[in-house]
Amino acid sequence: MKYDVIIIGAGPGGIFAAYELMKKKPDCKIAVFEEGYPLEKRKCPIDGEKVKSCINCKRCSIMCGFGGAGAFSDGKYNITNDFGGTLFEYIGKKQAVELMKYVDEINMENGGEG
């Protein structure tokens, strides 16, 4: 199959890139390739008893897979310039907050909780 766009990685950046492309160009054929396992098969072997620390799995189920490392987080986003990154240094504080709010709106529209 031929694609117009191929995105490598289904972490937040890849997911949002595909989302934005679909909005702007609905007929665009997009493929997202991810090295990790499907969400329902992602499981870290650390159990605290037999396996107490990272064993360097070939594909880390915490880091790799749909949603990236954020798939298993509590889902909180920091909508501030005070901590958590330096995006504002590149696009300005006002635009950074607007972009953070935009991402939050999309997450809420797709089942996120406030």
Where do the language-model regions lie?
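Conserved N-terminal/central alpha/beta ligand/cofactor-binding core
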Residues: 35-114
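Beta1/beta-strand and adjacent pyrophosphate-binding region of the FAD-binding site
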Residues: 1-13, 31-33
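Functionally constrained cores in energy, signaling, and assembly domains
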Residues: 12-13, 26, 43
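Conserved S-adenosyl-L-methionine
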Residues: 23-29
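Short linear functional motifs in flexible/disordered or boundary regions
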Residues: 29-30, 87
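Gly/Ala-rich phosphate-binding loop of Rossmann-like dinucleotide-binding domains
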Residues: 18, 22
